[in-house]
Amino acid sequence: MPAPCNCIETNVCICDTGCSGDGCRCGDACKCSGADCKCSGCKVVCKCSGSCECGKGCTGPSTCKCAPGCSCK
């Protein structure tokens, strides 16, 4: 039986404080909203307000690049 936080085995992405870095392996399909994802390899979804789009290499609100006048959350 796979570990519940092993996204690669279970094919379910768990973005939760209940998943520590131990045994938690997320693939590219794992996208979490916010900084609550404790899994290594999880991609954080970057959302920009309005019709703005995030720049490349965005890993979270702190490194989110949006068009001028747009805020990231």
UniProtKB/Swiss-Prot annotation:
GO MF annotation terms: metal ion binding
Family the UniProt entry places it in: Belongs to the metallothionein superfamily. Type 2 family.
The keyword Chaperone is annotated on this UniProt entry: no
Cystine bridges: none
Name this polypeptide is given: Metallothionein 10-II
Classification of source organism: Eukaryota, Metazoa, Spiralia, Lophotrochozoa, Mollusca
UniProt-annotated binding residues for Cd(2+) 6: C54, C66, C70, C72
Record's keyword terms, sorted: Cadmium, Metal-binding, Metal-thiolate cluster
Record bears the keyword Metal-binding: yes
Subunit structure: Monomer.
Binding residues for Cd(2+) 3: C26, C30, C32, C42
Induction data: By cadmium.
Purpose of the protein: The metallothioneins are involved in the cellular sequestration of toxic metal ions.
Positions of Cd(2+) 2 binding: C19, C24, C39, C42
Domain of life: Eukaryota
Residues reported in the UniProt entry to bind Cd(2+) 1: C15, C19, C32, C37
Residue numbers binding Cd(2+) 4: C46, C58, C64, C72
Residues annotated to bind Cd(2+) 5: C48, C52, C54, C58
